[in-house]
Amino acid sequence: MKIGIIGAMEQEVAILKEQINGLATTIKAGCTFHTGTLNGAEVVLLQSGIGKVAAAVGTTLLISDHNVDVVLNTGSAGGFDSSLNLGDVVISTEVRHHDADVTAFGYEMGQMAQQPAAFKADEKLMAVAEKALTQMEDKHAVRGLICTGDAFVCTPERQAFIRSHFPSVIAVEMEASAIAQTCHQFSVPFVVVRAISDVADKESPMSFEEFLPLAAESSSEMVMKMVTLLK
């Protein structure tokens, strides 16, 4: 099995990159691909760049050029579930766009035309994520809906909009729905496993930039355990 792993930013993939044996790096269309073995498994680690277009381009190349069998999306996310704290893990059951609106044509809010309203994460990959979680000491995780948009959600108004239209949302970020839609169109299984870097409506002593390395450490640990279980 060849495992595709996607992170948007250098900070989100750096720990995983350091652990790859036989590392080879290529760049195409602004996307950086690191290939080799991780914990004995064949992997392709993609640094896609930030946002949905970059993520869709990178995921397309990951699947079409590198022929990965599964896709794991890692990195950071903003927490919307009240039980979440910095460093906790979120596991997708489904992913939706929060900034798509073609409701004038009878679609649901967040549903892109001619696409499903939600992109379901693969059941087997979710089970692997759950098993990996049991190997992490005292790590809290929440499973559920992750929403994506091309905006860093930091205003009360935008938070309220997302909550009103997607009341079950547990976290938001900027790439997962594009990755999920691309995987859907290629019939490639995916799951999103991210760590919380900030939480809506909660004060934090650290800024997003300060906590990002810690979130990356948490999500990378989870991914490495999943890779070991998948190989």
Curated annotation (Swiss-Prot):
GO BP annotations, alphabetical order: L-methionine salvage from methylthioadenosine; L-methionine salvage from S-adenosylmethionine; nucleoside catabolic process
Pathway noted in the entry: Amino-acid biosynthesis; L-methionine biosynthesis via salvage pathway; S-methyl-5-thio-alpha-D-ribose 1-phosphate from S-methyl-5'-thioadenosine (hydrolase route): step 1/2
Residue ranges that the Swiss-Prot or TrEMBL entry lists as coiled coil: none
Cellular-component GO terms for this entry: cytosol
Alphabetically ordered keywords of this record: Amino-acid biosynthesis, Hydrolase, Methionine biosynthesis
Protein family membership: Belongs to the PNP/UDP phosphorylase family. MtnN subfamily.
Protein name: 5'-methylthioadenosine/S-adenosylhomocysteine nucleosidase
Species name: Aliivibrio salmonicida (strain LFI1238) (Vibrio salmonicida (strain LFI1238))
Gene: mtnN
